[in-house]
Every structure is written in structure tokens, then in C-alpha cells.
Regions:
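Glycine- and aromatic-enriched membrane alpha-helices
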Residues: 1-149
Length: 149
């Protein structure tokens, strides 16, 4: 459900109802695949699947918006603000614009995150010690248990 909401957010004002349903179904499968197969094969630590749901879902949603904006598919069309009316839909031009937007966003976020990760790593470190993680952070950081099991 969250993956569908993430994907339909960029398309909210442009996609028709059926297009939004199809986008949600497609992104659900893509995000499930990414959160299981890709995450396990790459071996990165994402316990809440934040990147698999929000990152991948947002990318698929942004690209899907370029498809679903087509009036022939029930979309709202692309507004041409220079003449003040709906412009003719050009799939190739729209997808190039969507790809540029996604690419710039991924680069900006990736570079900014890398800088911030390095700053945090230098100041306090990115991970807790292995023994503290094995013992449980509730005990090592808060000196109490969160769950009595």
C-alpha cells in the first residue's frame, strides 16, 4: 500500500483513476522485487526497506507519470504555459523530461547524502560497535528493555 502511495504521488494531478491503479500494481511488484531479490543480492543494510519502497517507488512513479499524463490513457495532458492550453502529447519528449528530472534528483540526493554520511562518520560514526548491536541497543544505550520476551 505504501509503495503505491509513493508512486502515485508525482502522478496525482496528471493520471486518471485507472492509470493510478495500474501504476500502483506495477510499482508494488517492482518494489517487492527490489526489496527482496536486489537487496539480498547486493547485501546492503536497509532494515525498513526505505530505499526499496520510497526510492524505487518514487523513481517508477516519476517515470510512470510521463506515460500516464497522456490524454489517450485518461491523463490530464501537459499544459503549455506559453499559450495557456493543453499541448500535444509527445511521448519521447515527455519521457526525456521525466528521465532528466529523475537523474538530476538522484545525483543531487546521492552527492548530498555521500557528503553527509562522511561528515557523520567522521564525527560520531555510522554504526554502533558489533557487541552493542548483538547485546541490543535498548540495553546498551538506554539501559532497559523495550520488550519483555
Amino acid at each position: 500500500a505504501v509503495a503505491g502511495l509513493v508512486a502515485v504521488t508525482p502522478a496525482a494531478g496528471y493520471a486518471g483513476p485507472m492509470g493510478a491503479i495500474v501504476l500502483g500494481l506495477v510499482v508494488g511488484v517492482v518494489c517487492l522485487f527490489f526489496c527482496t531479490v536486489v537487496k539480498n543480492s547486493l547485501g546492503y543494510d536497509d532494515s525498513l526497506d526505505v530505499f526499496g519502497i520510497h526510492g524505487v517507488g518514487g523513481i517508477v512513479g516519476a517515470l510512470g507519470t510521463g506515460i500516464l499524463v497522456n490524454p489517450a490513457l485518461g491523463g490530464a495532458g501537459v499544459m503549455d504555459y506559453t499559450v495557456g492550453k493543453i499541448a500535444d502529447y509527445d511521448f519521447a519528449a515527455q519521457m526525456i523530461s521525466q528521465l532528466w528530472g529523475v537523474g538530476v534528483t538522484v545525483l543531487f540526493s546521492g552527492i548530498g547524502s555521500a557528503i553527509l554520511f562522511k561528515v557523520v562518520d567522521v564525527i560520531v560514526g555510522l554504526r554502533v560497535p558489533v557487541d552493542a548491536e548483538r547485546e541490543g541497543l535498548d540495553i546498551t544505550d538506554h539501559t532497559e528493555r523495550a520488550y519483555n520476551m
